[in-house]
Amino acid sequence: MQLSRRAEIGNPSSRNLSPRINEKVELLGQALEHARRAGMSSSLMEYGRQVARHLSANVQPDEKILSLDIRNLPLLAASYNRRYPDLDLRHMDSPARFFDALNDRSSDGAWRAVVRLADGEQHHVAADVRTRAGAAPTIIVMEGANFYTFVASYFKLRGDSFRQLGTQAKWAFIEVGAQKSAADCVMFGVQFALAAYRELPTFDAWHDNLHHHGTIAHEGDYSSDYMPRRHAGICANKPFSWGEVPPSDLLQALSLQQCN
């Protein structure tokens, strides 16, 4: 690692970090150096430096990092949408905005979103959506942490859905449970949205099941412990590997630092 990068993010080799963390710090350092040479905005550079310092110190993201994640999420979504034109990843900064998008029944469509779960709160979740011409949408929500932590917000979301979308919209909620810190939700949401895109045939089948008989399980499967999170495309530790997103893209490098 070059001296300039060490000054920005610290020297991970001097600490007892795992090879995986060392690799992430090195790759993020490369992305920062590339972004600096490209003249990227100072606010985005500061975001990258803050994330890199947390990684190098081997500490969990905090509320400051979460605020930076939220602030830069539209840029991050745009970056991924350029790379994957059919992804259609959106930032829904309020439940109301999410419902507005779900009310569009003009055409068939598939898109993903990282959604603020409740007004006035910072917690975000991932959603994979199918809209249908003249019919209600189906929505698969992926919670990175624990449902019970946010149970009041989920009850409100469902109640608001009935009022704004009617009773025909079909929802499925998957508790992935991979998030262990209090401030990783945005980046886990991004990764789950990307995993849903990568596993498109599986999610298409789940949406069809949800549309036709109200559950993502196959018809006739009444198992109470049916947990699609076991599918490798959802809960794999590395939904998108570093090799698939070059470290020269600072935004995409940042999206991988917390959940891989």
Swiss-Prot record:
Question: Binding residues for CoA, per the UniProt record?
Answer: 123, 180-181
Where does the record place the catalytic residues?
Answer: 123, 143, 185
Q: Which InterPro entries match?
A: YopJ-like (IPR005083)
Q: Write the Enzyme Commission number(s) for this entry.
A: 2.3.1.-
Enumerate the catalysed reactions: L-threonyl-[protein] + acetyl-CoA = O-acetyl-L-threonyl-[protein] + CoA; L-seryl-[protein] + acetyl-CoA = O-acetyl-L-seryl-[protein] + CoA
Q: What does this protein do?
A: Serine/threonine-protein acetyltransferase translocated into infected cells, which mediates acetylation of serine and threonine residues of host target proteins.
Q: What is this protein called?
A: Serine/threonine-protein acetyltransferase NGR_a02610
